[in-house]
C-alpha cells in the first residue's frame, strides 16, 4: 500500500524544463526550511537546513540544489567546506541566501534542540553554488535578549538593510523581531534598536512586498513530529516593515493566536511550512516553495524527518494570498512558465 502511494506521489518526469505540468514533491528526500535565490547564471538555487538524508553520506552542511524551472531540481553540493566554529554545539539551520552588494550572503541559525542560547550567523560566497565562507556570529539569544533566536530573514527597504528572526517561546520577550544591519549587511550596529512585529507563536518569518503591502508569512506549531507534525503557515500584511501586521480580521500579529490561514496539512502531507520567498514566473504567477512531510513515509533511516521540497501556486484575492484549498497539491498542476 505504501509503495503504491509513493508511486503516485513521485514528481512527473517528462521532457525537461519545458514541461507543462508538475506534481509534488519537487525534490526529496529532504530540503527543510528552504530558501531560494536566482543566480546570475539563470539558475534557481535552493538551500536547506543541515540534515542527514540517510544515504550514508552523513550530515550535509546546508545542501544546495538548483533548477531552471522550480520543478526539476538537482543536488549540487554542501554550502560549507567546514562547519562554522563560533558555537560549540548545534547545526546550521534555516539558511536565508540573498545577493548583497554583489556577493551572496547566507544568514543562518546555529542551534540544537533545546538550545538555551542559539544564534544567527553570516557566511558569504562569490557564487550561489558556494563555497560559503563563514563571517562569524551576528548575535545570539543572550546578546539580543530574545529567547530562541533562530530563522533569520533578510530584507532591504528604502536603501536600508534589515534582518528579521524569531521562534517559539512563552517568555515575555519572545516574538519575531527585526533590526537594522550595517550598510555592508555584515553586522548589527545597535541591537537595542530591535523592533517586534509578531508574537512568540510564530517562527520562520518571510516578508515580501506586493503592491502597497508587505506580507508576513510565518509558521506555527510543531515542525518535526513526523506524520503528526502540525506546522502550518499564516499570513498578515502591513504598509510598513515595522508593522502593524494585521490578519484578514484586523488582528495584530503581535497577539498570539492571530494570522490568516494560508497552508495546512491534508490527508497525505503533514506539517507544510517554513516557506521561501515566492518567485514570480514569466507569466506573472507567484510560486511558493516550502517543506512538508509525507505521512506514508515520514522519516529517513537515520530518524530525521523526511521534509521534502514542495511547490504550489499563490493566487491573490482582494489583496490576500491564497493556496488552493489551503493545502499541499496532490494532483498534476500546471507548471511555472520560464522562457
Where are these regions (language model features)?
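Sec-dependent N-terminal signal peptides
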Residues: 2-13
Amino acid at each position: 500500500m505504501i509503495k503504491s502511494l509513493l508511486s503516485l506521489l513521485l514528481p512527473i518526469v517528462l521532457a525537461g524544463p519545458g514541461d507543462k505540468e508538475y506534481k509534488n514533491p519537487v525534490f526529496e528526500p529532504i530540503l527543510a526550511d528552504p530558501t531560494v535565490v536566482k543566480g546570475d547564471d539563470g539558475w534557481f538555487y535552493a538551500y536547506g537546513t543541515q540534515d542527514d538524508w540517510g544515504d550514508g553520506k552523513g550530515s550535509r552542511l546546508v545542501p544546495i540544489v538548483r533548477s531552471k524551472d522550480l520543478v526539476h531540481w538537482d543536488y549540487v553540493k554542501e554550502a560549507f567546506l567546514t562547519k562554522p566554529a563560533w558555537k560549540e554545539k548545534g547545526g546550521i539551520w534555516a539558511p536565508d541566501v540573498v545577493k548583497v552588494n554583489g556577493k551572496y550572503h547566507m544568514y543562518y541559525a546555529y542551534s540544537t534542540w533545546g538550545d538555551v542560547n542559539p544564534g544567527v550567523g553570516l557566511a558569504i560566497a562569490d557564487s550561489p553554488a558556494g563555497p560559503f565562507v563563514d563571517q562569524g556570529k551576528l548575535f545570539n539569544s543572550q546578546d539580543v535578549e530574545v529567547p530562541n533566536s533562530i530563522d533569520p530573514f533578510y530584507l532591504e527597504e528604502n536603501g536600508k538593510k534589515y534582518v528579521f528572526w524569531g521562534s517559539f517561546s512563552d517568555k515575555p520577550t519572545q516574538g519575531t523581531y527585526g533590526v537594522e544591519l550595517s550598510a555592508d549587511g555584515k553586522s548589527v550596529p545597535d541591537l537595542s534598536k530591535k523592533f517586534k512585529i509578531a508574537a512568540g507563536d510564530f517562527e520562520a518569518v518571510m516578508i515580501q512586498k506586493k503592491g502597497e503591502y508587505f506580507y508576513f508569512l510565518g509558521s506555527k506549531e510543531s515542525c518535526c513530529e513526523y506524520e503528526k507534525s502540525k506546522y502550518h503557515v499564516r499570513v498578515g500584511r502591513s504598509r510598513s516593515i515595522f508593522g502593524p501586521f494585521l490578519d484578514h480580521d484586523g488582528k495584530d500579529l503581535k497577539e498570539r493566536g492571530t494570522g490568516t490561514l494560508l497552508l495546512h496539512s491534508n490527508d497525505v502531507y503533514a506539517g507544510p511550512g517554513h516557506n521561501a520567498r515566492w518567485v514570480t514566473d514569466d507569466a506573472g504567477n507567484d510560486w511558493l516553495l516550502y517543506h512538508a512531510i509525507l505521512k506514508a513515509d515520514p522519516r529517513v533511516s537515520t530518524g530525521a524527518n523526511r521534509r521534502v521540497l514542495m511547490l504550489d501556486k499563490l493566487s491573490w484575492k482582494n489583496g490576500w494570498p491564497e493556496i488552493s484549498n489551503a493545502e499541499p497539491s496532490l494532483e498534476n498542476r500546471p507548471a511555472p512558465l520560464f522562457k
